[in-house]
Curated annotation (Swiss-Prot):
Disruption phenotype: RNAi-mediated knockdown results in gonadal detachment during gonad migration. RNAi-mediated knockdown upon tunicamycin-induced ER stress in a cdc-48.1 and/or cdc-48.2 mutant background (insensitive to tunicamycin-induced ER stress) restores the expression of ER homeostasis regulator, ckb-2. One of its GO terms (molecular function) is ATP hydrolysis activity. This is RuvB-like 2. It is found in: Cytoplasm; Nucleus. SUPFAM superfamilies: Nucleic acid-binding proteins, P-loop containing nucleoside triphosphate hydrolases. Forms homohexameric rings. May form a dodecamer with ruvb-1 made of two stacked hexameric rings. Possesses single-stranded DNA-stimulated ATPase and ATP-dependent DNA helicase (5' to 3') activity suggesting a role in nuclear processes such as recombination and transcription. May participate in several chromatin remodeling complexes that mediate the ATP-dependent exchange of histones and remodel chromatin by shifting nucleosomes. Involvement in these complexes is likely required for transcriptional activation of selected genes and DNA repair in response to DNA damage. Has a role in gonadal development. The keyword Cytoplasm applies. It comes from Caenorhabditis elegans.
Length: 448
């Protein structure tokens, strides 16, 4: 807390949540799609990352929509990390929907409807819209109010660019919009002619000396050039599921926010598909096939796989990425055993990426990256201890120990996390193997 002229000023504390995969920023590939050993928050898994990079390239070029990809490997081998890295590489414009296979089982909607909704959320459409806007620096804003304050407000707005200056007469709606945005002379604004929406772009550099001090939210921008009235092309990206929900009932947009979508009729989706294909042929819209990631894919039953068999071959279908850690498993709903718990006919349609277990060096680097992500300083000996513990426990358990050790370090008022702090956290929190051992030794005391 700082003191300014006898007044206590509190520092603004930025709260950031760090998840298990928050350190991942991409696949870490170069221009030739070759994976670097440590890059983008990813460590090792060179072959798997290169394969995922090829998938990303084909998605961006629109060559692999309607396919299925399976990521296999042991627990803790980085399967989900690869999927998240793919989503980061694709960017915000490409829809990426992540679900767990058990999510589709519900009493409210059937399995195929839940899968269809997930499919449609992973299908985007970019709609182009041309709008006319007024953009310039405000020279003056005059508002005339009636004497009793009850009548409509009118006003005049003077705007200029580097090339011209114009005066506009404002009605009551535009006056209210300007007052709501607190528009004042020197502001650079943008007015949408169709909707009347006023947007403050910032403060003009020409008026930067009007005040000695300005708040952190004040943005200084150049005065626009050219004509005040311009045509702007805006691209809106929406998913097909949102369009389905809005058109499924009278007040569909309410269900869009509440999440109570229910089952949507096939006729509604067929009409939307026809309209989307028409827009694509006319050049009004661009179809963006996204990615549907299904974790724990072995939890899907035979009915889901039979539905997916046909769904991935449709004209409007995203890329499906599945992940599983099972070897040989019975296909749910049958007595037939198959690799990864997935029917053989569906496996034949998939490209398979194998995530190999991390080496000791990989683990040390991952733990070091996690420490940097969480802002924890470790002694070299403490990091070595974590690597040894990982061999006896698991990588996830050791990642959890980092945060616990940091709390113990703060309580003991030490400057850096040592082996003693790691040991204290290890004794307080049990891993799976030690917990199973205690259950076996003290089984008589538990309810059977």
């Amino acid at each position: 807390m700082a003191t300014l002229d006898g007044i206590n000023v509190k520092d603004i504390v930025k709260v950031e949540r760090t998840s298990v995969h928050s350190h991942i920023t991409g696949l870490g590939l170069n221009d030739r799609l070759e994976a670097e050993y440590v890059s983008g928050g990813m460590v090792g898994q060179v072959a798997a990352r290169q394969a995922a990079g090829l998938i990303v390239k084909m998605i961006q070029e629109g060559k692999i929509a309607g396919r299925a990809l399976l990521v296999t490997g042991e627990p803790g081998a980085g399967k989900t990390a690869i999927a998240i890295a793919i989503s980061k590489e694709l960017g915000e414009d490409t829809p990426f929907v992540s679900i767990v296979a058990s999510e589709i089982y519900s009493n409210e909607i059937n399995k195929t409807e839940a899968l269809t909704q997930a499919f449609r959320r992973a299908l985007g459409i970019q709609i182009k819209e041309e709008t006319e806007v007024l953009e310039g620096e405000v020279i003056s804003l005059e508002v005339d109010r009636s004497a009793n304050g009850m009548g409509p407000k009118v006003g005049k707005l003077t705007m200029r660019t580097t090339d011209m200056e114009t005066i506009y007469d404002l009605g009551s709606k535009m006056v209210d919009a300007c007052l709501k945005e607190k528009v004042m002379p020197g502001d650079v604004i943008q007015v949408d002619k169709a909707s009347g929406r006023v947007t403050r772009l910032g403060r003009s550099f020409n008026r930067s000396h009007d005040y000695d001090a300005m708040g952190p939210k004040v943005k200084l921008v150049q005065c626009p050039d050219g004509e005040i009235q311009k045509r702007r092309e805006t691209v809106h990206t929406v998913c097909l599921h949102d369009i389905d929900v809005i058109n499924s009932r009278t007040q569909g947009y309410v269900a869009l926010f509440s999440g109570d979508t229910g089952e949507i009729k096939a006729e509604v989706r067929d009409q939307i598909n026809k309209k989307v294909l028409e827009w694509r042929e006319e050049g009004k819209a661009k179809f963006v096939p996204g990615v549907l990631f299904i974790d724990e894919a072995h939890m899907l039953d035979i009915e889901c796989f039979s539905f997916l068999n046909r769904a991935i071959e449709g004209e409007l279908s995203p890329l499906i990425i599945m992940a599983t850690n099972r070897l040989i498993e019975k296909v749910r709903g049958t007595d037939v055993e198959s690799a990864h718990g997935i029917p053989s006919d569906f496996l034949d349609r998939m490209l398979i990426i194998n995530a190999i277990p991390y080496t000791k060096e990989d683990t040390a680097k991952i733990l070091s990256i996690r420490c940097d992500e969480e802002g924890v300083k470790l002694q070299p000996t403490a990091l070595d201890l974590l690597v040894k513990l990982q061999e006896a426990t698991s990588l996830r358990y050791c990642i959890h120990l980092i945060a616990a050790s940091e709390v113990i370090r703060i309580r003991s008022k030490a400057e850096i996390v040592t082996t003693d702090h790691i040991g204290s956290a290890y004794r307080l929190f049990f891993d799976t193997k030690r917990s199973e051992k205690i259950l076996t030794e003290e089984s008589a005391g538990f309810l059977q």
